[in-house]
């Protein structure tokens, strides 16, 4: 398939730059993947479509405030550091700007010197391995000095770091938020549980590769980035029981969907497991793990649009997106949501 098959017109004014004051104030476009019919709803209306016995699967990853601004100890030149992946001990794979003049042995100071980093290895594409030194607990120092690594299409500053975290964020490690989860409040989660809906949690640490554009014409040639995922024994048991009882498994976000599909591609049922996934889902893929999906509106020609097209059908999805544009839905990380399901299975 050609990458242009997943292109669509998107006015720049529809790219949400800031989150809404109330998490649940977002709109919800409901798409019947069987018929292609759409309905315009508010996010709390999700309660009308999720039945007792169904299970929502949420990604409990926590975004690191992974963008740091420091100065070279020797020259005072300013440096921007983006943490990508923790290696052994206090060593991290990072992206550094400007990278050209940051050589092995260079020391960077952050804040008032409570955090320093030494370059220990040069990598490709501006990457550097930095070894950090600090007093106390690294993540507490990072919380004080770091900024949220917002996606490149968001130009506004974020006033409240917590608005780029889900209310159930728990396990640190993401470079970006699992944005479908941003719409949920504790109150809405409680209402779902009171209705008899199960809540299950997985972890997938979102990498910056999620924003990497597809650079090939034929999408089958695209290579996905790898991301760490984990499923507990308790979650696996719950999901298998939901399946046995005839309930639907609804992934909250493409990260949850990719985790569930990765596990079901490798096993006959859900199991306790962890590892790295580079699963690439596009039309023609046969879903084994999920029955529905709650997700935000994604970038043209992105792997996420391809994933959602695989579930909803490409024409259904592009028609729904055209409707969303016409109705001025808000797009991308701080935007509105859609719920994709098959009405035939909705009792």
UniProtKB/Swiss-Prot annotation:
Gene3D superfamilies: QueA-like. This is S-adenosylmethionine:tRNA ribosyltransferase-isomerase. GO terms for molecular function: S-adenosylmethionine:tRNA ribosyltransferase-isomerase activity. The gene is queA. It comes from the Bacteria. It is an enzyme of class 2 (transferase). NCBIfam families: PRK00147.1, queA. It catalyses: 7-aminomethyl-7-carbaguanosine(34) in tRNA + S-adenosyl-L-methionine = epoxyqueuosine(34) in tRNA + adenine + L-methionine + 2 H(+). Transfers and isomerizes the ribose moiety from AdoMet to the 7-aminomethyl group of 7-deazaguanine (preQ1-tRNA) to give epoxyqueuosine (oQ-tRNA). Belongs to the QueA family. Its EC number is 2.4.99.17. Keywords: Cytoplasm, Queuosine biosynthesis, S-adenosyl-L-methionine, Transferase. Monomer. PANTHER family: S-ADENOSYLMETHIONINE:TRNA RIBOSYLTRANSFERASE-ISOMERASE (PTHR30307:SF0). Its main location: cytoplasm. Pathway: tRNA modification; tRNA-queuosine biosynthesis. GO terms for biological process: queuosine biosynthetic process; tRNA wobble guanine modification. The keyword Transport does not apply. It comes from Halalkalibacterium halodurans (strain ATCC BAA-125 / DSM 18197 / FERM 7344 / JCM 9153 / C-125) (Bacillus halodurans). It is found in: Cytoplasm. InterPro entries: QueA, QueA_dom1, QueA_dom2, QueA_sf.
């Amino acid at each position: 398939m050609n990458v242009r098959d997943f292109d669509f017109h998107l006015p720049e004014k529809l790219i949400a730059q800031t989150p809404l004051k109330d998490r649940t104030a977002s709109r919800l476009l409901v798409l019947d993947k069987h018929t292609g019919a759409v309905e315009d709803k508010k996010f709390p209306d999700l309660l009308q479509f999720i039945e007792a016995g169904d299970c929502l699967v949420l990604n409990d990853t926590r975004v690191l405030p992974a963008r740091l601004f420091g100065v070279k100890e020797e020259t005072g030149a300013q440096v921007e550091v983006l943490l990508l992946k923790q290696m052994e001990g206090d060593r991290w794979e990072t992206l550094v700007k400007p990278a050209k003049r940051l050589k092995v042995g260079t020391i960077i100071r952050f804040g008032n010197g409570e955090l320093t980093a030494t370059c220990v290895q040069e990598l490709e594409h501006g990457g550097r391995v930095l070894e950090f030194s600090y007093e106390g607990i690294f993540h507490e120092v990072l919380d004080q000095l770091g900024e949220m690594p917002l996606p490149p299409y968001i130009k506004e500053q974020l006033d409240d770091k917590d608005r780029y975290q889900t209310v159930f964020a728990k396990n640190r490690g993401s470079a970006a938020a699992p944005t479908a989860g941003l719409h949920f409040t504790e109150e809405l989660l409680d209402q779902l549980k009171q209705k008899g809906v199960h809540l299950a949690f997985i972890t997938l640490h979102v990498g910056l590769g999620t924003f990497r554009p597809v650079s090939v014409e034929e999408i089958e040639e695209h290579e996905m980035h790898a991301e760490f995922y984990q499923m507990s024994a308790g979650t696996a048991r719950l999901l298998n029981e939901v399946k046995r009882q005839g309930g639907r498994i609804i992934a909250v976000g493409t990260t949850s969907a990719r985790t569930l599909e990765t596990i079901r591609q490798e096993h006959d049922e859900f199991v306790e497991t962890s590892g790295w996934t580079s699963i690439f889902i596009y039309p023609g893929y046969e879903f084994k793990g999920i029955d529905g999906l709650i997700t935000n509106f994604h970038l043209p020609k992105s792997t996420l649009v391809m994933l959602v097209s695989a579930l909803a059908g490409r024409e259904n999805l592009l028609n729904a997106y055209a409707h969303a544009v016409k109705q001025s839905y808000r797009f991308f990380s701080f935007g509105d949501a859609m719920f994709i399901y098959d009405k035939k299975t909705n009792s």
